[in-house]
Amino acid sequence: MSHYEAPIRVPLIKGHKTYRDITEDIARPIEERAGKLWWISLYASLVLFIYGFGCIAYTIGTGIGAWGLNRTVNWGWDITNFVWWVGIGHAGTLISAVLLLFRQKWRMAINRSAEAMTIFSVVQAGLFPIIHMGRPWLAYWTMPIPNQFGSLWVNFNSPLLWDVFAISTYLSVSLVFWWTGLLPDFAMLRDRAVKPFQKKIYSLLSFGWSGRAKDWQRFEEVSLVLAGLATPLVL
């Protein structure tokens, strides 16, 4: 008489789906035409973008005093939003990187959203120090790059320079971490692409991914290293 043996781990994907079913589920949002809800969300985001761009133009034209920087008893609009967006980015990194280090497989359901949220948040956070300068077209002056202006050089005691190094480092690690996780999906879209232009683009994005055991071994090693680098950045 046979006895019941409980599985060692609960399956991550329920419904008895095959690899083909999983591939179809992943590729469907990209290969199918966008729905009505997507277009509504796009137009709503475009309206908010135009409004935000107008506010930034007003700030640059009027002066950053419009952000309340003349009030010494509270924080100005720029540092408040900068810290808020950095906090959102840290949350995304902790969700994805820390769960990977602790081998929590269920992170696969939310890691893409968390990593994309991190990149978007860091980019948004980087805008506020640039706008805070009052002359955003001179933002490159905060970078230690050779120039022909004589004595023009960065001030390593300035918090603006600290922001440049912090944001650029955090964005670089987060971007590579996000891109590494997308390599198998880019390769899948490359193999399914019909148009030569799409196949070429996905081939470049997938970095020659073939799905061999060696690729997966390096994929896991690099992911662990990047997660180990990203986690101290938010602590």
Language model: regions and residue ranges:
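Perimembrane topogenic segments of multi-pass inner/organellar membrane proteins
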Residues: 1-29, 132, 144-167, 173-177
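N-terminal signal-anchor module of multipass membrane proteins
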Residues: 2-91
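Cytoplasmic juxtamembrane interface segments
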Residues: 12-25, 92-114, 194-213
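Long, contiguous internal "core" modules enriched in hydrophobic/ aromatic residues
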Residues: 29-32, 36-56, 151, 156-235
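Membrane-interface interhelical loops and short amphipathic "cap" helices
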Residues: 55-80, 134-160, 213-219, 235
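Juxtamembrane/interface segments at transmembrane-helix termini
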Residues: 56-67, 71, 99-111, 133-142, ...
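Membrane helical hairpin/interfacial module
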Residues: 72-137
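Membrane-embedded alpha-helical core segments of multi-pass
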Residues: 118-122, 135-138, 169-180
